[in-house]
Each structure stands twice: as C-alpha cells, then as structure tokens.
C-alpha cells in the first residue's frame, strides 16, 4: 500500500529526486515543497480564511475606529505585489515543469489563496481587535515554504552547477520570501485605535485592560504581550496600580459558580459524591488542552536522540569517506555516487535547532494552561470555602476552628493548585518511558529488556515508600492545623496573655507542637524523600549499565559511539520522568490528603434552612412580627444527646413594641436571639420572623475599618439619617475626640475603642440599617448608666428612633425593663414568666417583680420616666416617619472587575479603609513590603539558619555527584571509541566495572546531599526562624496588634513558614544542582569544540541580561502577590469572628462579593507573576536551542577541518541536548528561590519587631512578696497609645493607700481603661511614673510586674483547651485551689455539668461553649487564684445578670478584703461602698474623694453621674 502511494506521488512529481521528503543533500525535495508545504498552506487559507470572512461579515462592527495608517496600506500593497510575483513565477515555468502536477497545482492554489487573504486583510482590520490567526499562520507557512524552496535552488546550484527554474525563478522566489515575511511582520503589529478608548477605559476602571485579551497568536506563544509590564517593572518598582485587569473568564465569582454547580450536581446525583470529579468537570477541558501540548512536546523530545544518531552516523561516514575515497556510501541510493555533502551535516544541525525551538514553544503553552487551571481551582475553591463558612452549623463550626479553615485556604487549596503542574505527568511520565524504551529497543535490541525488568523490580519499593510518605503527610497536615490553631488563639487573646504574663507557657505550648511534633515528623519525611530521591537517581544508571553489560555479552555488534550517545541521551530523557514521578506521586499524596480535608469541610452540616421561617414584613403597629410556638425546642447542635439550648418556648414580639428578655448567666438569653436568627437547630414547634433583621451581638463585632464603614455596613450613605444615628447612639462626643472623626481606623476587633464605644458603634450599625426587626443582645451592658439612659430614650424608648420597629432586647439592665412593652424571664433554657411591665408590678410574688424591687428604681408607671428629659437632641421634630426608615438603600451591584473591585481591595488591604482607590495615609496602614532585590543579608540569614557547615557539605556533595556523573560519560566515550577502533568489545568487564563504580558513587553522593539538605539544613532553619518570629511577636507591644490585622500575622505563621518548611530547601537544592549541571555541560562542550567559547560568551550576556531584566519585575510581582493575599485571610478571619452579625443582617452575598474581589485582586498580581516566568523561560530556552545549534554547527565545521571524532561529537551534543531543560529548571528555581526567600524576608521583618520592655531586669527584681502592701502612687503620670496620638491620661497625681477599695468612673472615653493598662505597662509613660510599694514599675521587668498584679479585664478572653489550662496554664496551683476559685466565682456547678472530666472539661475556641457572662466569671476565677495584693476589676461583671452581680460583688468584698482593689464599673451601685472614687474626665482626675463626700456636693461630676443613673434624686 505504502509503495503504491510513493509510486503515485512520483508520477505526479516527475522529478529525478523523487517525492522525498528529504533529499540526498538533507533538505526538502522540490516536489515535497510544492506538493505538500505550499499546497497545504494554500488549502489552509482557502478553507479557514473563507470561514473567517463569513464570520467577520456577520459580526457587528466592534465600534472601534482604527487609523487608516501605513500598516494597512502596506499590507494590501504587499499582498498585491505577492500576487504579481506568483503570477510571474507561474509564467516563468519551463515546459517540463508545466507537466509537473505538483508545481501547477501549487501555483493555482496559491493564487486563489492570495485573493482570499486580500479580502480577509481588508475586512478583519475594522472588525477584529486581535490580528487574525489564520492570516498569521498562512503567511508563516508561505514564508517557510518559499524559504525552503530558495535553499533547495541554492544547494543544487552549489553542488550541481544548475539553476533549477532558472535565475529568474530564483530571484522571484527570493522576492516572495521577503514579501511574505514583511506581510507576516505587519500583520503581527498591533492596531492603533482612532479614539484612545483604552485610556478612557483605564480612567474609568483604574486598571489597564489585560493585553492578553488583544494579543495575537504569536504574541501569546512567545509571551510578548507581557513585555510592556516587564519594561515597566525594569524601569521602576511595581505597585498595584501598574497591574492589569484579569483576562476575560478569570473572575473568581464566575469560576466559583461553575464549580459550585458541578459540586451540587455531585451531591444530588450520587450517593458517593466526589469533589475531585466536580473539579475535573469544571476545569478538565483546560487540562486536556494542556495534555495535547504535552504529548507534542514529549514526541519532539524523543526526536532529538534520533537526529543525534543521524548526525553521529554522518560524522562517522564522512570521516570514513575521507580516509578511503574509494569506499561506497552505505544507506544512500546508487544514483548519487558523489561524496557526502557537508551541507547535510549543517541541515541536520539546523533540524535539531528547529525541533528544540518548537519544543520550547509547545512546552510553554502547556505550562500556561496548567498554571491557568491552577489559578482557576485556587480562586474557585477559596471563594467556595468562604461561602461554606457562612452557612456552617454550630456543630460544624465547633469541628472546624478558625485556624483549621484558614489552613484549608492557605495550604490545602495551594496543594491542589500545585497538583495541576504535575497532573499531566501521571500519563506523560509512563508515555515518555514507553517511547524511550521503544527507542532503546530499536537502538540496542533485546538487551534493553533488562532495563524494563529493573523498572518493574523497583515498583513495589516505590509503592512502599509512597505509602509511608502519605501517612507522614497526613500527620504533617494534622500537626500544621494544631500549630495554626495555637498561634491563632495566642494572637486572638494576646491582650490577656500579656496582662496575665502568660507568654512563656503559651510559647512553650506552641513550641511543643512545632518542635516535638511537626518538625520531628518533617525530619522523618525528609529522610524518606532522600531514599526516594536516591532510588530514582540510581534507576536510570542501573538501566543503562545493565543494558550495556547485556549488550556487550549477548550482541555480535560493537558498542560504538553511534549507539552509546543516542542511548545515553535516551537514558537522560528516561531519568526525567523517573525523577519527576516521585514528585508527582508526592504531590498526588499531598493533594489527596487536602481533597479529603476539603471534602470533609464541604460536606459539613449547614444551618437548618427552615429553623426559622422568614416572612414579609408586617405593616401595622401591634401586629405579631416574631412568633415562636408549639412548645418550640432548639438544640445548639443537631446531635440529640447534645444539651438542649431552649425548650418549650412560646414567645411573641410585636411591631412597635420593646420586648425584654432577662435571666441569670447561662439561662439562654443569647440562645433565644440565636433561634430567631436561625442559628440553632429546631426539633419541635415553629419560628417565624417578619421583615428584615438587624442584630447586635453581646460581644460587639467591629470590622477592621473606619467608624463610618462600621456604621454604614454596606448601605448607601444618607447624610441626614447618619447624623441622627450618631446622635441617638451617643457617638457625637466620641467622634469629636477621635483624631479623624468617623474616618478613624478602629483596628482589628475595634481594638482601639473602649468597650462602651464598641457597644454603641455596633448599635449604631443596627439603627442605620433601618431594618424591620431588631435583635439586641445586651448592648447596654458595656455602657455607663447615663449613656444607657440616653440610648434607652433616643433609640429604644417610645420616642426613640426605633419606636415603630420590632425590638427584642436581652438585657441585665433593670432600668430598661420599665419601658418594655413585654418582659420574659428565662431560666435554664425555658421561659418561666412573661408579661407586660404593669402585669409584673402587680404580682408581688413573681421573680421578675423581686428583681425590679430589689435592684431597680421603683416606678409605678413608665409614662413619665423619660418625658421630662432635658436632653432631646434627637427627639426634636426630626423623628422620621415609618416610610423614610424603610428606605434601605443598599450599594448598587457594581462591576467589581473594574474600579470598585480595586477600591474594595485597596480598602481591605488598608484595614478596610475608605472605598477609594487613592492612598490616604490617615485612613490606611498598608502592609509594609520591601522593594528591589532581596538583600544578600537575607540569603546569609537563611544560610546561617541552615547552619553554614551543613550548607558547605551539601554543596560539596552536589559537585562530587555531578563530577562522577560526567566522568562516567567521558569513560563511556573512551570505551565506545576503543570498540569502534577494534570493531568488537574488548576488556568489557574492566570498562563496565569502572563505569559502574562511577555511577554508584554519583548516586550515593546524591543520597548524602539530600539527607544533609533535609535533616541538617532545612529543619534547622525552620526551627530557628519560627522560634525567632514567635519570640518577637509575643514580645511585641500592643500597638503592633492594634495596627496589624491578625490575618496578616497568621499569614506569616502559615504561608511563609510553610514555604520555609517545604519549598525553600527543595528549590535551593534544585537550583544548585542545575547550576552545577550547566557549568559541567558548558565545560564539556568547550572541551570538545573550543570555538564554542565564542558563542557561549555573548549567549551568557543575553542570558544574564534577560534574567536580571526579568527578576526586577518578578520580584515585585511576587511581593505584591504576598501582600494582596494577606487581606483575603484577614477578611476571612474577621468574617468568621462575626458570622452571627453577617448572617443576622443577611449580608452573606455582600461579604462573599468582597471576598471574591480580594481574591481577584490577589490573582491580578499572581497571574502576571507566572506569565513573567514563562516570558523569561521562553527566551532562555531559545538560548538553549541556539546552544544546540552552535554545538552541532561547530561540530560539523570542525569535521570539515578533519579534527573531530564521532565520540567527541556524541559527548558534546548529548550534553547540549540536556541544556534547554536544565536552563528551564534554573530559571524556575531562580524564580522559586527569589519568591520563597521573600518569606524569609517577611519572617525576618517580624523577627525584628520593636519589643516591649524586658520581661526581667536583672539587678532590679522586686522581692518575692512584693507588693506586700498594695500602695499605689501616680506621680504626674501621662501616657498615650502611640507616639503620633494625643495623650489619653494627663498629669495624673493620685495616691491609693494599702487595702483601699477605689472605684473609677467617668464618661465613655474619659480614660478609665487606660488607667488600668498603664498600671500593667501595656502602655508606657510619656511623663511621670507609677510607684507600687516604693518600687517604680518602669524600673522592673514586665513579667515581675504583671504576674504580681491581678486583673479581671473588660474583654473576657477564653482559650481553647481545658478549664484547668484556662485558669492555671503554668500548673502552679492544686486542684483544690482551682475548684475553690470556681466555687467563689459561681462557675463550679456549670463546669461539673459540662462533662465528667471535671477540670479537664474542654472549652472551645474563644470560649464558644460559655456565655459572655460565664467567660467573665472564668476571668474572676483566674483572679481568685493569684495571691496579689492589688486587684483591678475592669467592668468585671458587665455581662452578668443583676442577681449574680450582687453575689459576685459580695464575694469580691469578702475574698479580697485585705487587697487594694481598683474597680471600673458601669453599674454605679456596685462601687457605692468603695472607700474612695476617682472621677476621670478627658484623661484627667476631675474628682477623688469618698462617695459620701462627692455626693454631698450636688455640683460634682460624680453627683451628676449618679443622678443620671437614678441612684439619687433631686430631693
């Protein structure tokens, strides 16, 4: 069949050379050029050109007017000129050529295709933004075909002295080459629009459109579209504004929706859903396209050894021919009796270059597609994790801590992204091995089967090693989660840690997980990786050695150079898939673990969708807006055995009414509000809520942004109502005090605000939302009495802003009950009594009446309580009508791909500052980033962390390994040349033994090198750097935590530490290995052909230039990637902390949208970063192809001089063929080193933070019993929170005597909490000092000060762990002492009821299984244990009910009667029995005297405060 086809082709051709395709000279035959290359080019144009013409004619005009400049005119003129040349050429053909069908058909088809091209050029110029792909490829094929024709004519004229087609034909062909190349160049040039629409677009979007969208096919293949950004990065330091928009179809919103749809289909349609399959269905098409490119690349990779063999055979034959001019030429046809032409060698060399060049182009299209797929997966999964976290049930939230979910985002998603780089190698590796083995079979015959046997034997060992590594990898992820959980908890509770001086025990807890679990496991993992690496290094050598051994003893042929070096090249090609397979398997193992973790998270239980039914709002005052009935029962978790949260609930709240819920600590007040939000699991009854909801949590959730952003909360700004809200929530004075007013940054969790300010800010957010229903969880607890009265009157009362709304208030503020329309008493999760205020006051035996009678101001009625208030700042004629309040104006759906996305992202990075693209230094503290090249001292710091001696040993063994490997190949060259000389295989045993010894030595050196890397370098550095950063962060002052989002710090402990642990050592290793390999390769080539040095010097200049040109841009892009990633985690952590609030306001979509914008912002830095890598790699691999061309061409040139043997050519080119791949790896590893060393730079930045004062000052340590008296003196004391801020305490001069009980009062922001922080040196003195028992506290260490004082802080922070660990983390006290403390703090009963573990009962993250009141009591228990003479109570019982408060206050009086007590309290009645009262006003001591003395003066500030609290009256 094949013979018939050849015969038929020859008849069509009628050429003495035949159809070919390769001629005797090594070029294409004329028939092949005309009949195949040029004919196919024309058919391609006719077929696809007409298709594009039709499509463009149907397409609407793009709307962009292009200038009719010289480019289009030149194109059209040149096409017409090409038509003329083809016409002249067709007229110039001879009679013989006219009978040649291939020539005639070529001219006919070319002429037709040119007219199609002419029409397409004209139409596409106006109707397409991108240069037409069909035209580009057509002119490329035409240029190539005509150039091949030109070479064909020249070679035959040189060797045969004949002008085929005549001299005229040659000149016309030359002109055709020039014309086609010119048109190709002009078509590739970008078009210039008549209107500068891109600049307008850029102004509107604040981001430049991505040039990838408008780049032509060649620009995309060569990554030239990146050149603009590369140039910008070379000329200046890149900032976010320099980045492009993401290309089309890259938005995380679009990607996550596709993945979510497929995941939901999996859940619906399958009993065993697969997350992997959902990901494959969503993004598999891109991976298939990548697979197509990879297959082409792999085939081309194995073409090179065949070309090498042809070249060596040519060299052998040429040398043989020179030695014996009469010898016959074997392998060629008899009609070519002349000598072997040297041009054939040059053409083989050029073919090797062309294959290498094509290989590079295809490889990087493969990489582009896999990296894009990785981006898609990362964006989609990150967005889905965020969305899932918004709907997790309480039970699922308990299973997944914040640290766990952050790890899913930062580590597990990253592992899946990394997997995309390796995924195609799972088939490509075996495919390469099969091609390689087949090629070896064709080369060496049956002896290659021994190699197959070795590979099969190694498989079980490989499988065993992989199983162990998978097990260790699972453990590694578990320990990583545990460490992240501990560090997350430390950061969230850092204030308590410092107040209690618990830094040391918690640092030890963290180091226990890090050093004794995580790093120990990583050491084992490193050792197994070293064994795996040794196995895969020795396998290719064993295969080659055994194959050669079997060959020399079984085959009758000599093992000559034309067999050895192609075989050696194939063995080198075999080593890549064998080397990469363990990485692939390791990546698969890591990804499978991560997929399992993500699957578990995505299948976690969600909130019960019908827990509460949301209905349209009610219209009339008095209509039921909240209805819970049929003895409704709710659980915190779905498990039936779990403790019931609420039972037998029958509850109603009406529009326009205020319904109050009261009860003891832990009675279920918060649970009742949670069930209305839908956060609990309903097992019985029903629950309905009408209209929109606004929720104020008991612990105010404040976003890391400005005051204004916290109030607006995504709603449109309404200046008039905003002002009303500010006044009603008593924030006017606070905003006047704050430096930037409502533009002041409040810090993470509102850390720069007092408790009262946070409570009122949270309430203002609810008021401004203008919802239908308000669920308020004790917002009055953290505010002073007079502020509480203001809020009751102007917000909650009958004349307040919310008088027409449905209001449910859980409270312990008895004064609020008097204005309630309905009151419900909860006890142990059950409503025991409910009714109106009048009904309760009539029943003298009811529990509620007793509560009011004993602790509240008795009022027979409620009508006049606030009627005569003089403060009617909000109640003027400005109370808005119902309709006005309902105008809830949300932000429009903005195109966040454009300007607003950037604004949000910029704001998020600036701790959610202003929604403004510009940098405002007052609003934003952006994350610091270094600029320019990573300083050498960072590399030295890492080398020092790795242990310099170990680093030297590591590099030494790399050099030894590579030297032995090269010597093995040199020995093979020598052996094969001996065999060629003798025509047999003499002394085979001796040659094999030496070759074997060199190979084993090289593999053993690699094993030692890898063990040294992991065990003695990487682990050492990981431990050192983590310890350094941990110590520094724990010792940082509170100002650092106030101005730095926790997510940003956590990013350093998770992402940056992960890079140091897992990536940095590996990348340094591969960089050094490949750098040494390139050095040896160039040395071998230069030793073989010394002239090569004249090629390598200019190429090295280009190489270094490109690398440096690139590194400037890449470095900044990687830093921007790191910096834009931090806000994702910060926002995520912040959201998890305020889930109830986000869900309460139904803001899930908005918050998901913000998250997606932040992801897109991060991707807009990551996308150019990976493409910059491709941009450089493409250019450097082109240099690698030129090295192959240079080495091969010089070999042929020296052959002509008669100074080169086949062995030298084989050795030189076998190394040259490796250099492209090696250069590629050097580029990648240079990038990875630069990228990952930035993590060391970032860790070092946090390791060098400004520290607090020393923990211990030797020589100034106080006595053990200090303070023995409790005497406190403030001497002209002033302080501020940060150097740039105003003083918060001014010239304080007070003396508190031993055992004195002192109350501290003042309006919000007066400086009450600042006074206690000053006592603990959380803020340092700006002037003056504090003296305790005759020792100035600024002279002693912080540990000696803080652990000697006792405090119950305003923010009651609880750690994940046991009750014992929370109360006594140092294990300093006995169980009896701890139980006694719990008993005195009224928590013993609750702890016993939690589980049978007693003091080992588990508390969840943040004390989630305790109420806020119980958390405060736990802090009280801590204080009970510390035998300090000084106790500070900072609103210690603000969140407990009145009855518990009374008992606790009594306990404090008796248990601490011999101590000095400073009490800050909003309930003024709790400090009325103090010895003296400090009244603070604007940071100064306004009054300091006994309560009686201060009350006797009705003009005193204290008197007015008591008056407002209802503790005194005017009579």
UniProtKB/Swiss-Prot annotation:
Gene3D superfamilies: ABC transporter type 1, transmembrane domain (1.20.1560.10), P-loop containing nucleotide triphosphate hydrolases (3.40.50.300). Signal peptide: none annotated. One of its GO terms (molecular function) is P-type cadmium transporter activity. Cooperates for the ATP-dependent vacuolar transport of bilirubin and glutathione conjugates. One of its GO terms (biological process) is transmembrane transport. The chain crosses the membrane at residues 33-53, 74-94, 100-120, 131-151, 170-190, 279-299, 346-366, 423-443, 447-467, 531-551, 573-593, 944-964, 1002-1023, 1067-1087, 1089-1109, 1181-1201, 1206-1226. It catalyses: Cd(2+)(in) + ATP + H2O = Cd(2+)(out) + ADP + phosphate + H(+); an S-substituted glutathione(in) + ATP + H2O = an S-substituted glutathione(out) + ADP + phosphate + H(+). ATP 1 binds at residues 663-670. It comes from Saccharomyces cerevisiae (strain ATCC 204508 / S288c) (Baker's yeast). Its EC number is 7.2.2.2, 7.6.2.3. It is an enzyme of class 7 (translocase). The modification Phosphoserine is found at residues 251, 873, 903, 908, 914. Residues 54-73, 121-130, 191-278, 367-422, 468-530, 594-943, 1024-1066, 1110-1180, 1227-1515 are cytoplasmic. Keywords: ATP-binding, Cadmium resistance, Membrane, Nucleotide-binding, Phosphoprotein, Repeat, Translocase, Transmembrane, Transmembrane helix, Transport, Vacuole. GO terms for cellular component: fungal-type vacuole; fungal-type vacuole membrane; membrane; membrane raft. Residues 626-853, 1272-1507 form the ABC transporter domain. The modification Phosphothreonine is found at residue 911. It is found in: Vacuole membrane. Residues 1-32, 95-99, 152-169, 300-345, 444-446, 552-572, 965-1001, 1088, 1202-1205 are vacuolar. This is Metal resistance protein YCF1. Belongs to the ABC transporter superfamily. ABCC family. Conjugate transporter (TC 3.A.1.208) subfamily. It holds the Pfam family ABC_tran. Residues 287-590, 951-1235 form the ABC transmembrane type-1 domain. The gene is YCF1. It is a multi-pass membrane protein. Present with 396 molecules/cell in log phase SD medium. ATP 2 binds at residues 1306-1313.
